[in-house]
Amino acid sequence: MGKQVGNVQLMQKMNRLKVLNLVRRNQDIARPAIAEQTGLSLSSITNITTYLLEEGLLEECGTEQAERVGRKSTLLRFRTEAYGLIIASLNENHAEVSYTDLEGKIQACDTVEIVGLSAERVITRLEEHITTLLDKFGKENTLAIGVIFSSLVLDGSRFVLSSSMKWKNVDIKKSLEADTGLPVYVENISRSKAIWYSSTNDRDEKNMLFVDLENGIGAVQVYRGAINRSLLGEIGHTTVEKDGEPCFCGNKGCLEAMCSAKRVIRLYEEQTGTEGTDIAKIAQRYEQGDPAARYAVSDCATYLGIGLANLIMMSHPAVLVLNESDFAQCPMLITDAVEECKRRAYPALTKELRICRVMVGREETLRGAAVELCDRLFDLGSAYNPVQ
């Protein structure tokens, strides 16, 4: 008898999560549409949505704009302010610790300077600022903490290495969970950006590649609307030059070692014997025909083109999205890299390939991170799921 009751409760929870996650992804949706898309009866949908409304996870938001005769259905929406999230976004210079709602809308943000600090000291600073935010907004109202940065993350949240942070095997998850008592999820920031982009653009594309050129080079595949987690995406640590520049990972000739804004500047300064320039000035001199600028940009662009061609040959995307970021002030490097890519990849794979160049900002990245956190939290296997 107990087993039968348990099975009923499990099925009830599964259906509640199915409805909640459908509404999360389809704001302003009516109960009949939910029933149609989930395959559940309308009476079941009524019971489930009543529970979710009482728990504060859904809210009613007017009636549908339908031309049909008869009573219009009430629309439902995911209530993003039901709980809060803390998201820490790190780079080599600073960390931004934000308190957001469930869709990543910022309610408070602290910037922490971390230049020159050890990993242990950075974690301590994060703990201090997270504690301040929890005191302000309430730990009981906060579902989880997300930590996002350019990094190799395995098994969902196990951090391994970050070339940009110069960290290896730092257990940031364990440290923050022990200090806060909240679940902590560590994620590669490129994935957060890709999640935001795919949820707001090209949602119907079956196969999209998102390549992030900020603080290294990472790739994310979105296949049939979902992140392909079997593709690790560490294109930045694939070898493109046998005896190339040394990389923090311990290898030589990694793509992100051979193509970075820092390397463009270094190549230019080696050619000219100057110091103190920046990539924007090099781009300007490239346009003026400066041989040193053209050499520095073209050399790095060639390696990026090789990396992109390798990706295309392996995954055959319909859309290639390039987050320019570090090279936004040197757009000709991206242009040259795309041309190199097309020269090296099979023409049949690039003939109909659509290439988009974008700039994913801070707020968009946080929204992507929030989507990822909610996907993990509102999951049947999550021990921190608020749905019963």
Where are the regions a protein language model picked out?
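Extreme N-terminal segment that seeds HTH/winged-HTH DNA-binding domains in transcriptional regulators
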Residues: 1-31, 36
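Glycine-rich phosphate-binding/hydrolytic loop that grips phosphoryl groups
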Residues: 8, 13, 21-24, 185-200, ...
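Glycine-rich phosphate-binding loops at beta-strand->alpha-helix junctions
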Residues: 37-41, 317-340
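Conserved phosphate-binding catalytic cores of ATP/NTP-utilizing and phosphoryl-transfer enzymes
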Residues: 60-85, 184-208
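Gly/Thr-rich phosphate-binding beta-strand-loop-beta motif of the actin/hexokinase/Hsp70
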Residues: 70-108, 209-223
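Glycine-rich phosphate-binding loop and adjoining helix at the ATP-binding site
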Residues: 106-207, 331-343
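Glycine/GP-enriched mid-protein hinge/lid loop-to-helix segment characteristic of carbohydrate kinases
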Residues: 109-111, 118, 180-284
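A mobile "lid/hinge" subdomain adjacent to the ATP/sugar-phosphate binding pocket shared
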Residues: 255-321
